[in-house]
Each structure stands twice: as C-alpha cells, then as structure tokens.
A protein has these predicted regions:
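Sec-dependent signal peptide recognition
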Residues: 1-7
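A solvent-exposed interaction/effector surface
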Residues: 2, 12-177
Length: 177
C-alpha cells in the first residue's frame, strides 16, 4: 500500500513541474479571463495517434535525436472534423532553433499572438464538459459585449492523465480586444 501512495505522490509532483505557456490576463469577467498570448513555438499534428506522435517527437524522434522537455498546456482543437493536438515547445526554442521532426505529419511553427477568452474547469475533460463550458463561455462573452473572432473551442489540458485531484482544463475562444 505504501508503494502505491509513494507512486501516486511522485506522479502528482512530477506532473506539476512542467514549463507552462506564458500569457497576460488583460481583463477578468467573473469566471472568465481575457488573455493575451504572445507568439510561442509549437509542434502540431492532425493525423491519427496525435498524442503518441507528439510524444515520440519530444522523446527524441527528431533529426537531432534531442529529448525535449514536456510543457503545458496540451492544446486540442477540432476544425472541420479534423482533430489537431499541439504541444508548446520550451521557451528556449525559436524559429531558428528547434528540433526538426522525423514524422512529416508534425509541423513546428511560431504561433501568432492573440487575445483569447478562457473559462477553467476541473476533473477529467470530455466532450460533454467541453460543450458545456464552451456554451457558457460564449454566453458570458455575448453578455459582456466582447466580439468573438473565432467561436471554435480551443481546449487546453494542463495535467498528466495520472493526476487525479486538482486538475485544470480550459476552453478558449479567440476574441477581439
């Protein structure tokens, strides 16, 4: 029993040590934040086995054979029935300095800056929760008279699947600010 408790504690501690994508909160509206996200290097894939492909990339399946530190959040979108997953690369990487993926389905790019409205929720994320919080976010934005640039939800997950308590997930939409 003690070894299971120690395993749980180590997994929980390990999952909290990742570099997290930077953003600036520019406005708070009750449970909603309007944030500015500066450009950041990301790796994305829209092919089957998204997480596995990206995890292999950061585990050394790249031209340099370089192991890349995991970061948070993991970003997921569904545009036109195409699921895309993105990992934020550590801040030391730039357009001139990044590990080139061997998997040609993975694209590494510098994201555009932008303003996004975010709503946070706990527990494990699923389709029903995403729909619920996406609807709530859009409702609150209409009430606040904030213009939505792209209403498609961006789902952010900050925790390892092994973390059971105090999980953090978010739904974002791009807004004009």
């Amino acid at each position: 029993m003690i070894k299971y408790v120690l395993l749980f504690i180590s997994i929980t501690m390990f999952s909290q040590g990742y570099e997290t994508q930077k953003y600036e909160v520019v406005k708070k509206l009750n449970e909603i934040e309007v944030r500015f996200y500066p450009p950041v290097m990301k790796a994305k894939v829209s092919a089957g086995g998204n997480f596995s492909r990206l995890f292999k990339y950061i585990s050394g399946n790249n031209e340099q054979g370089e192991k890349i530190s995991m970061t948070t959040p993991v970003q997921m979108t569904n545009q036109d029935n195409i699921n895309t997953m993105e990992f934020v690369l550590p801040s030391k990487y730039s357009e001139d300095n990044f590990a080139v993926p061997k998997d040609r389905n993975i694209t590494v790019y510098n994201s555009d800056p932008g303003h996004f409205a975010a709503i946070t929720y706990g527990g494990y994320s699923n389709t029903e929760k995403v729909k619920k919080y996406h609807s709530l976010l859009l409702k609150k934005l209409r009430e606040s008279k904030l213009e939505v640039v792209n209403s498609k939800p961006v789902v952010l997950s900050y925790n390892s699947p092994y973390k059971v308590f105090n999980r953090r997930n978010e739904v974002l939409v791009e807004v004009k600010y």
